[in-house]
């Protein structure tokens, strides 16, 4: 009985950790507003002055201004943490809008950096009355009331993706999914990585760790005759495949009754709703691609469909009613009429497709310029 409870506990924990399946309008498996941290700790009247100074230094100069993404990236770089740890922290807190932190999310980011620096897990917050203070070097980056720093930001604090210089730690996916796209490193490197305190902190933040057995599929070699649109479809299908395969690794050894129980919880229901959105995006892409879909992408799509049929009873298949759907433009990714449009770089994207792309493929949306 103890083993069964342990398995159930692991599944629930992994469902919570894997809540970063990018879908529009979903707050994920986390608390509203700031993501991983209790909302009470993120109240601006309670956060340490250090947090408010850091917010001002990052572009949040008024009571409603959001932090400047480019400045936040620079601030993260002063923490001394490895780039993959910073990437995971960003993915954990960036919930509301890809590439732009809200003010509570910014506070969450600072708190997770502090925990990672100390090698502590999220559980440590239970014993804290206020948010931990991270070490950021140089501290001169934060202006004080007596010596305010000049600002050159004359417009909005939001920096569009296209104006942000590429950063090696900008998250393109959760770390477990990112690892599925990489080759296995040598044993010596793996031992070194596991012995690193910073890596241990990242593992604490990540929750359960998948084994390397789910990384057996190699990334398909790009066809030299592939058009930009076909490449976009291939990348999108593969990103969905990775999301679905991660879910399969989570549930494949679980009994149907256990999965059913999870699907009836608030967090489990949101998880399966997110999977359902990923499946819907897959069908939109396949409908546009038709016979132009590559052989490998076709295999991945069929694999996903088989699992969708297997999990159909756990997912709410009721179509969402969108009374505001009056836009007849097509999404630059799936090439189907947009349901929740977002404009970027002179193109129109469906929000679900855009979030999937930013979290699973690249931090920059594709430039296809559909007519």
From Swiss-Prot:
Domain EH, first and last residues per copy: 43-148
Protein name: Uncharacterized protein R10E11.6
Ranges for region Disordered: 179-205
Coiled-coil region list: none
Stored InterPro entries: EF-hand-dom_pair, EH_dom, SYNRG
PANTHER family reported in the protein's UniProt record: AP1 GAMMA SUBUNIT BINDING PROTEIN 1, SYNERGIN GAMMA
């Amino acid at each position: 009985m103890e083993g069964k409870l342990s398995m159930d506990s692991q599944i629930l924990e992994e469902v919570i950790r894997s809540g970063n399946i990018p879908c529009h309008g979903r707050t994920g498996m986390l608390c509203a507003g700031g993501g991983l941290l209790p909302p009470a700790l993120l109240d601006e009247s309670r956060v340490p002055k250090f947090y408010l100074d850091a917010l001002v230094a990052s572009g949040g100069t008024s009571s409603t201004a959001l932090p400047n993404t480019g400045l936040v990236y620079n601030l993260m770089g002063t923490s001394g943490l490895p780039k993959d740890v910073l990437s995971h922290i960003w993915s954990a807190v960036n919930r509301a809008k890809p590439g732009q932190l809200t003010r509570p999310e910014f506070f969450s980011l600072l708190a997770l950096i502090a925990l990672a620096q100390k090698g502590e897990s999220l559980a440590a917050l239970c014993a804290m009355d206020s948010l931990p203070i991270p070490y950021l070097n140089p501290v001169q980056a934060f202006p004080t009331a007596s010596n305010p720093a000049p600002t050159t930001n004359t417009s909005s604090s939001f920096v569009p993706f296209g104006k942000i210089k590429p950063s090696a730690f900008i998250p393109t996916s959760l770390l477990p999914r990112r690892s599925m796209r990489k080759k296995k490193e040598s044993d010596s490197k793996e031992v070194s990585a596991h012995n690193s305190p910073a890596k241990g902190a990242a593992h604490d933040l990540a929750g359960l760790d998948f084994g390397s057995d789910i990384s057996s599929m190699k990334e398909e070699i790009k066809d030299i005759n592939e058009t930009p649109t076909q490449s976009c479809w291939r990348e999108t299908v593969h990103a969905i495949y990775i999301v679905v395969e991660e879910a399969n690794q989570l549930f494949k050894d679980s009994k149907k009754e256990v999965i059913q129980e999870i699907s009836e919880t608030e967090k489990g229901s949101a998880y399966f709703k997110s999977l359902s959105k990923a499946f819907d995006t897959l069908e939109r892409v396949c409908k546009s691609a038709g016979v132009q879909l590559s052989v490998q992408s076709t295999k991945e799509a069929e694999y996903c469909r088989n699992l969708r049929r297997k999990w159909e009873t756990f997912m709410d298949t009721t179509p969402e009613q969108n009374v505001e759907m009056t836009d007849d433009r097509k999404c630059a990714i799936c090439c189907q009429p947009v349901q929740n449009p977002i404009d970027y770089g002179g193109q129109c994207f469906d929000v679900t497709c855009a979030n999937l792309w930013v979290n699973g493929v690249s931090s920059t949306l594709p430039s296809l310029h559909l007519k």
